[in-house]
Design a protein with these regions (language model features):
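Alpha-helical cap/lid subdomain in secreted, periplasmic
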Residues: 1-140
Length: 140
């Protein structure tokens, strides 16, 4: 099994190299992602692939201009979802998972799930693992 979660660092690169909201290069992201998947399949044609949606929450640095950065993250997520379909991979909707958790009235604050808006806490990782097992575990 090849399980891949990438995308947020692409946002971080754009965020760190600019003075304000900029666009992420989704064409390059897709080309690089395809290269990884194609080379993996070439090495092991039987590999089962799991592709995870990148995610952010409005915590830490993402709070400023969150709507813009979230739209950029969603663009990357759409690429991942498309590739999952093309490569017959399992798709893990992690942004959807964290959106649902963020809107749960029992959540004390968003940093309960992600301490900086990018990196999950232990509680966030637990929910990700549960989703992974639900979607992938039955196919093992």
């Amino acid at each position: 099994i090849l399980s891949v979660l990438v995308g947020v660092n692409d946002l971080l690169d754009v965020y760190n190299k600019t003075d304000g909201p900029q666009e992420v290069d989704t064409a390059r992201f897709e080309a690089d992602y395809r290269d990884i998947l194609d080379r993996s399949r070439a090495q092991n044609p039987e590999v089962r692939i799991v592709l995870a949606e990148p995610f952010i929450l409005p915590v830490g640095m993402w709070q400023e201009h969150y709507t813009h950065w979230r739209a950029q993250c969603d663009r990357l997520g759409a690429v991942v979802k498309k590739l999952a379909k093309e490569y017959d991979a399992v798709f893990l909707p992690y942004q959807g998972l964290f959106d649902k958790l963020a809107h749960d009235a029992r959540t004390p604050k968003l940093s309960y799930w992600m301490w900086d808006g990018t990196h999950p806490t232990a509680a966030g990782h637990e929910k990700m693992a549960e989703l992974w097992m639900q979607r992938v575990g039955s196919k093992l």
